[in-house]
């Protein structure tokens, strides 16, 4: 059995700095990664976003921050919704939307139960954060969002499925 990439999010450590979001925008905005992704629009897309939750009120207020992104699902609904093999779950666990094959496949946006797939109107293609697959394939040990997280709220690990249960 092959080890798979997983992103572990420790919500107790997230401080809402948005470094992860900025790293993704820096890597993908107006930049094409052939076979991996078309250029991400400069504005309007947050392939990694941070949801904010508030509980209580003054003087006792609890605020939480939850980074959200593509979960690279084991049984990814986007893979099932895709036509002509436009979305693939790789052996290493990473889900990749092929920017050429996915042209015009807006149904992929609705297929994601987590709202992690975005429609790029300019490119006419569905897009998501692909775990920086192009960097991983070039030998990087972690995606950029993990690399820039100042608190360690994001961790990438490569393990067998049985170790994640």
Locate predicted features.
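Non-ligating segments of multi-cofactor redox enzymes
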Residues: 1-165
């Amino acid at each position: 059995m092959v080890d798979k990439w997983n992103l572990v999010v420790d919500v107790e450590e997230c401080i809402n700095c948005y470094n992860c979001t900025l790293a993704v925008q820096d890597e993908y905005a107006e930049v094409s990664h052939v076979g991996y992704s078309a250029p991400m629009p400069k504005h309007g897309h947050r392939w990694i976003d941070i949801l904010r939750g508030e509980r209580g009120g003054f003087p006792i207020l609890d605020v939480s921050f939850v980074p959200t992104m593509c979960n690279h699902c084991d049984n990814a609904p986007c893979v099932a919704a895709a036509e002509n093999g436009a979305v693939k779950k790789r052996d290493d666990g990473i889900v990749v939307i092929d920017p050429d094959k996915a042209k015009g496949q807006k149904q992929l946006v609705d297929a994601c139960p987590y709202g992690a797939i975005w429609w790029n109107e300019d490119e006419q293609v569905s897009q998501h954060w692909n775990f920086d697959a192009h960097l991983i394939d070039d030998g990087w040990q972690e995606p950029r969002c993990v690399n820039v997280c100042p608190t360690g709220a994001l961790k990438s690990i490569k393990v067998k499925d049985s170790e994640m249960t």
